[in-house]
Amino acid sequence: MDTLLEHEAADLYDEQQIDRIGDAVTGDAGDDSDDTLEDGQQLLGVNRQMDILLDAPQEPPMAVFPARGGPNGGPPRLRKKRSFYTMVKPTPPCQSREPEMCRLMASVTRAMRQVREDQRGEYFANYLVENMTSQNYPNGVGLPQHWGQF
């Protein structure tokens, strides 16, 4: 263990002596500011290269691999994978924009358009009582059987 410490101490002394000799040769008298500046610039260069690598995209651009179909030729790639549930699907033109409803509700809404807004609630109830009869809808045909069914 002592030999290891002596060896390290000798290396440190040799490095200091070499540094002093280098200072004497260059004439800067122990001022190592130029060396630290170069080391700092070199360190900044390494960090900048690392920053560039970290900011780079995870896969190479498609122009590097023209056989896969980059911008030069082939089908364009999708920019982003999308969920099946969030994609917009075109609706067929035969479907109307109005919500689906039974005949009774359709005739109620049609009739309510002719009534003033402050009387619509009362008119709605009276219309249902008058028109939701077995005479108008025999055996309940045309009426919803349960909530949510049209």
Swiss-Prot record:
Disulfide bonds: none annotated. Residues 60-84 are annotated as: Disordered. Keywords: Developmental protein, Differentiation, Glycoprotein, Spermatogenesis. The keyword Nucleus does not apply. Signal peptide: none annotated. It holds the Pfam family SOTI. It comes from the Eukaryota. Belongs to the male-specific scotti family. This is Male-specific protein scotti. It comes from Drosophila yakuba (Fruit fly). The lineage of its organism: Eukaryota, Metazoa, Ecdysozoa, Arthropoda, Hexapoda.
